[in-house]
Amino acid sequence: MGNLSVNQNKLQKRLRRLAGEAVTDFNMIEDGDKVMVCLSGGKDSYTMLDVLLYLQKVAPIRFEVVAVNMDQKQPGFPEHVLPEYLKSIGVEYHIIEKDTYSVVKEKIPEGKTTCSLCSRLRRGTLYTFADEIGATKMALGHHRDDILETFFLNMFYGGTLKAMPPKLLSDDGRNVVIRPLAYCSEADIEAYSKMKEFPIIPCNLCGSQENLQRQVVKEMLQEWERKSPGRTEIMFRALQNVVPSQLADRNLFDFKSLRIDDSATPRFVDVMSL
């Protein structure tokens, strides 16, 4: 890739800045960390690796970056693509070979979405491998749009207000998951991926259709953004400004103990005395 245009340079700086802010805001990476970057071969994980390698050079702390891909033995998976790319940029990497494809095909009826089980099997394998190589952080490539989509999916279909946190401790307490692209938009990542000409591996090799509910939510958010530019950013900001007393979760706020405080100073003006 030659010299960057003005817009390309702005794009690169914006992604690096936003990723750096997310890493700092949530203390994602600390001095001496070994960060296992989970690389699928898609635009998001390539961009995450690229940005983390830049941050590794300029950060005031020292941390290792190790790229890890899981070959799930999907038919047609181009096994040579990731090793060739990672060798070309000089990054330490591991390829985990585990035939979860056959397991998923055996368990899920034909025509049903396999993504959920496939994801769980992959996550469990990656958690175990992170332990084996002594990784202190596990980096995933989810971005701002993924987080918002998950929030609305959980609200619409699960009856819960939760999304994907930028930083997460696994249920067993053995792994810390980080999402350095949490502040970055999918549109920027897609543009950056094309600019950098990453060797993208298709995500539909297994033949499974994208989760229909997620696709509906994605299209809804895209339509909102088209009609009201900037709405996505405002909605994401809302996830960072939660006011428990204005919701209805009794576990987050003690509504039962609310009582009148006779010593409190009135907030409102007595209009009758004006």
From Swiss-Prot:
Its cofactor is Mg(2+); [4Fe-4S] cluster. One of its GO terms (cellular component) is cytoplasm. It holds the Pfam family ATP_bind_3. It is found in: Cytoplasm. Pathway: tRNA modification. InterPro entries: Rossmann-like_a/b/a_fold, TilS/TtcA_N, tRNA_Cyd_32_2_STrfase, tRNA_thiolation_TtcA_Ctu1. It catalyses: cytidine(32) in tRNA + S-sulfanyl-L-cysteinyl-[cysteine desulfurase] + AH2 + ATP = 2-thiocytidine(32) in tRNA + L-cysteinyl-[cysteine desulfurase] + A + AMP + diphosphate + H(+). Binds 1 [4Fe-4S] cluster per subunit. The cluster is chelated by three Cys residues, the fourth Fe has a free coordination site that may bind a sulfur atom transferred from the persulfide of IscS. GO terms for biological process: tRNA thio-modification. One of its GO terms (molecular function) is magnesium ion binding. Its EC number is 2.8.1.-. Its main location: cytoplasm. CDD domains: TtcA-like (cd24138). Keywords: 4Fe-4S, ATP-binding, Cytoplasm, Iron, Iron-sulfur, Magnesium, Metal-binding, Nucleotide-binding, RNA-binding, Transferase, tRNA processing, tRNA-binding. [4Fe-4S] cluster binds at C115, C118, C206. A motif (PP-loop motif) lies at residues 40-45. HAMAP family: TtcA. Catalyzes the ATP-dependent 2-thiolation of cytidine in position 32 of tRNA, to form 2-thiocytidine (s(2)C32). The sulfur atoms are provided by the cysteine/cysteine desulfurase (IscS) system. Homodimer. The thiolation reaction likely consists of two steps: a first activation step by ATP to form an adenylated intermediate of the target base of tRNA, and a second nucleophilic substitution step of the sulfur (S) atom supplied by the hydrosulfide attached to the Fe-S cluster. Belongs to the TtcA family. This is tRNA-cytidine(32) 2-sulfurtransferase. The lineage of its organism: Bacteria, Pseudomonadati, Pseudomonadota, Gammaproteobacteria, Pseudomonadales.
